[in-house]
Amino acid sequence: MTTFKEAMTFKDVAVVFTEEELGLLDLAQRKLYRDVMLENFRNLLSVGHQAFHRDTFHFLREEKIWMMKTAIQREGNSGDKIQTEMETVSEAGTHQEWSFQQIWEKIASDLTRSQDLVINSSQFSKEGDFPCQTEAGLSVIHTRQKSSQGNGYKPSFSDVSHFDFHQQLHSGEKSHTCDECGKNFCYISALRIHQRVHMGEKCYKCDVCGKEFSQSSHLQTHQRVHTGEKPFKCVECGKGFSRRSALNVHHKLHTGEKPYNCEECGKAFIHDSQLQEHQRIHTGEKPFKCDICGKSFCGRSRLNRHSMVHTAEKPFRCDTCDKSFRQRSALNSHRMIHTGEKPYKCEECGKGFICRRDLYTHHMVHTGEKPYNCKECGKSFRWASCLLKHQRVHSGEKPFQCEECGKGFYTNSQCYSHQRSHSGEKPYKCVECGKGYKRRLDLDFHQRVHTGEKLYNCKECGKSFSRAPCLLKHERLHSG
């Protein structure tokens, strides 16, 4: 039986994802995956208890180049021959999407071509001119035993610490802990990237708006806001997304999957962050505070929308009527008013809606569901935003004021509708008769005159009404 020592290659310690598993990672996670594998390769060169010869191994990090000089043992017809090669691997620019093929080929293949590399540890230890910098004093030298037939392989380790290190790679043990927040990581490189959050280090700056980021992958994702690039396409409906994670969340709209449930009211959500924001409605927690007026919000997106009230910023403009909006989604919904498009249909009554949220609210008319309850008066609401608006009745808060007359309102939409009384604007036109209205809700009520639709039924006598206030007025006749 022949025994010899061989260096553990990168493929021995790499964390390998399948194509399907990698498809679930967003760009930042792929960047982290690449960094972790590079860290693993550096560990192979740096953590051994034997020193490596300067002329045989050299691994350095320059501006954007990884360079490696390897000694490769090649076997040919003429016998063993030592050949030295210089391998240069250029890092991808900030605008490159790292696919599975690129990650594995550039790192696993290019950096580990030394599959047949043999390290003569006794020779290198005598040189001693390239001191090894270790973090854990670990050696990554395998002892490989081959039978005379060449068909037996048994990896072993020179001491217990070597085995512990090797096992950690397979077990996913998170031994690197952040001193700031206590979060754990499998690899020191992942910890270093995470620590930039606490240090406030932002090395990557957007040339367009000047915004800074701690990771180049975050900058790349941000730049798509300016370019409009949406490389991730939904195979079901063709909708594009700038981030893979957003596409993964969108897929759940087609599958109907809502794995995150609220324990208070039972409402289900597609994403964990949606559940966390929703739960703050029950707890009353509002951690996001406006620096200008001090108003607090349960979600960062709500704070961002509110901030535009102070700046009056409305960057999204309708090409048809020149109306401006603070959000692109609001502009897209508005355009359907001009086109008459109502893509979301109710399966119960066939009524169409411009946005999915309106359809969801409409479904509650049929089910009678009102999951949001006011703790002050017990009144129930179908939508969380309606509850928040209602709570201002109890608090007396009227944060939205008319610039013309100074009148205060509970909601921005009420203030906006009121301002049309000064301007005389009636942007919502009936396609049947051309009559204009200040509010879309009034237009919806009016259109029922043409359609004959009466959604609100009296439980006592079965009489139907086109508007909820008419039903309430009628029910008082029965109650006396």
UniProtKB/Swiss-Prot annotation:
Presence of keyword Lipid metabolism: no
Example GO biological process: positive regulation of transcription by RNA polymerase II
SS bonds (residue pairs): none
Domain of life: Eukaryota
Pfam family, one: zf-C2H2
GO molecular function (one): DNA-binding transcription factor activity, RNA polymerase II-specific
Keywords: DNA-binding, Metal-binding, Nucleus, Repeat, Transcription, Transcription regulation, Zinc, Zinc-finger
GO cellular component, one term: nucleus
Phosphoprotein in keyword set: no
Family from the record: Belongs to the krueppel C2H2-type zinc-finger protein family.
Protein name: Zinc finger protein
Organism: Chlorocebus aethiops (Green monkey)
